[in-house]
Amino acid sequence: AAKAQATADSLAVVAAAEHAYTIDPSTAKVTWKGVMLGVKQHHGVVKLADGKATVKGGQLQSGSVTIDMTSINSLDSAYAADDAKQGTRAMLLGHLASPDFFDVATYPTATFTITSVEGNTATGDLTVKGKTNSEKVTDLVVTEGEGTVSITGNLSFDRQKYGVAWSSGAKDMVLNDAIELTVELSGTAQ
């Protein structure tokens, strides 16, 4: 009985231990969506440059990610690779990279650093175009395996708070202010 209790105690200590993970940028998936005129959507992906996370008892404790904004890409079916609309796709990507929007030449990365976690919501500092605001990652799911972790969640932010806007007010009005991100990360123990 004493041996069984010692094993149970050891397992409880392991389960309660904090584990640090390095996020693998090659397997990370960060998708984005923006809505125009309330009906037309643009969506795509952006690559992760690096990331780290600390998990304790299956709960995210801390973490940060750096996003490579120069990798922003569109997955709109209207701009498929074999489509004749490649010029339109290039125009969209050029506009997203421009100073009006993400200004990737000046700000090649964006970051998110967790400041607190409550339940399945992580609050943190999002920095885009050199501007930092508090944002929330919701629907957070953390799954630990043998030396691995999987983290998913959603983040919606107001692009206006980061200066992501057309210079023309009339054009800017056709685009919803909310940009939605879906994040799927995996990492290995450090």
Task: Give the positions of each predicted feature.
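Low-complexity, acidic/polar, glycine-enriched regions of mature
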Residues: 1-190
